[in-house]
Regions:
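Active-site beta->alpha loop and helix N-cap motifs at the rims of alpha/beta catalytic domains
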Residues: 10-112
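Short, Lys/Arg-enriched N-terminal segments with co-localized hydrophobic residues
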Residues: 1-12
């Protein structure tokens, strides 16, 4: 997928059906264990908990989730888990933290 296609996809997302972006956006926190590793089991349960409480959209990998402290692999894994456990609830994830544009595009591809 080209860089232009990714940009168009994001632009289309917000102009195509703006009414679909109404509702409650839950900003997902990242649960850490004592050793500072991510507790992915708790994260999956947390995603399900948010959905059960009526969130319309889940924002995984965001400022509230300590995204700047996570590795690219951890960010992708969190977004993947959120997508897996969210059912029909939309998941949004930040994928523009890498310094080089081509690295950002690669992270977006890994999250799709």
């Amino acid at each position: 997928v080209s860089e232009k296609n990714h940009i168009r996809k994001v632009e289309k997302m917000f102009t195509d059906k703006p009414e679909s972006y109404r509702g409650v956006y839950s900003l997902l926190l990242t649960p850490f264990k004592e050793d500072k590793s991510i507790d992915y089991d708790v994260y999956a349960q947390y995603v399900e908990w948010q959905v059960e409480r009526g969130s319309h959209h889940l924002f995984s990998v965001c400022g509230s989730s300590e995204m700047t402290k996570l590795t690219p692999e951890e960010r992708v894994k969190c977004a993947t888990i959120a997508a897996k456990y969210s059912g029909d609830t939309e998941v949004i994830a930040t994928a523009n933290l890498e310094p080089a544009w081509h690295m950002q595009v690669e992270e977006v591809k890994r999250m799709e």
